[in-house]
C-alpha cells in the first residue's frame, strides 16, 4: 500500500511507481527529475542533519547542493527571517528541539522552492512551535506563490494550510476536494471528524457512497 510518505518519495524520484506515471512541474519523474530538483525541497522532522556541523555549515552544504546563488546572503536572510542568528555557529547536536525545527525549515527554504514537500512538519512539536511553523509556511506560500504538498495526520493543520485535501486509506484515495466541500459532503464541521469517519469505515449522511 502507498502511504503519503511514499507519495512524496515518488514525487522526488526516490521511489518508482508500480503503475502509472508521475509528472511534477512539467517534468516526467524520474526521467527528468534533475531538471526540476532545484525547484523543489523537502522537510521532515524524521530526517536530521549532521550533528557535528554548525547550522551555518549545514545550510551552506545544502545551499551548494541546490546551486543557490549569493548563498551567504541567502543564509543571512534566513537567519533573520527564522530567528537563527543566536545559534547560527552552534553545532546541530547542541540545539534544542525548537531550534532544530527552525533550522530544518531554513534548509527547506534555502533554494526558495516552487514546490515544498512537507512530511508531518509539526510532529512532536509543542503547540507554540507548531503554530510558529504554520505561520511561516503560510507567509512563504503567499510571498513566493509556492505550492505546498503537506502529508499530515493533523487535520487542524490541514484545514489551515491546504486549499485541496486528498484523504488516503490503505494506499487508496478516499476523497479529493477542498476542505469545505469534503466537510459538507460528509455532513461534518471539521476535517478531524471526516478523518475519523473514514478511518473507522463510517459513511455519514451526504457522504459519497463510492470514494472517488
Outline where the language-model segments fall:
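Conserved catalytic motifs of ABC-family nucleotide-binding domains
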Residues: 112
Amino acid at each position: 500500500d502507498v502511504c503519503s510518505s511514499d507519495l512524496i518519495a515518488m514525487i522526488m524520484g526516490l521511489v518508482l511507481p508500480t503503475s502509472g506515471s508521475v509528472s511534477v512541474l512539467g517534468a516526467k519523474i524520474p526521467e527528468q527529475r534533475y531538471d526540476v530538483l532545484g525547484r523543489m525541497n523537502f522537510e521532515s522532522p524524521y530526517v536530521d542533519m549532521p550533528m557535528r556541523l554548525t547550522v551555518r555549515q549545514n545550510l551552506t552544504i545544502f545551499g551548494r547542493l541546490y546551486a543557490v546563488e549569493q548563498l551567504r546572503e541567502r543564509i543571512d536572510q534566513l537567519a533573520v527571517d527564522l530567528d537563527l542568528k543566536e545559534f547560527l555557529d552552534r553545532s546541530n547536536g547542541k540545539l534544542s528541539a525548537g531550534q532544530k525545527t527552525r533550522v530544518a525549515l531554513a534548509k527547506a527554504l534555502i533554494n526558495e522552492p516552487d514546490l515544498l514537500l512537507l512530511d508531518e512538519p509539526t510532529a512532536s512539536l509543542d503547540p507554540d512551535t507548531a503554530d510558529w511553523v504554520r505561520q511561516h509556511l503560510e507567509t512563504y506560500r503567499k510571498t513566493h506563490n509556492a505550492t505546498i504538498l503537506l502529508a499530515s495526520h493533523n487535520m487542524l493543520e490541514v484545514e489551515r494550510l491546504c486549499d485541496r485535501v486528498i484523504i488516503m486509506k490503505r494506499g487508496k484515495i478516499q476523497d479529493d476536494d477542498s476542505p469545505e466541500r469534503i466537510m459538507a459532503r460528509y455532513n461534518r464541521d471539521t476535517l478531524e471528524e471526516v478523518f475519523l469517519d473514514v478511518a473507522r469505515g463510517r459513511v455519514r449522511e451526504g457522504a459519497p457512497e463510492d470514494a472517488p
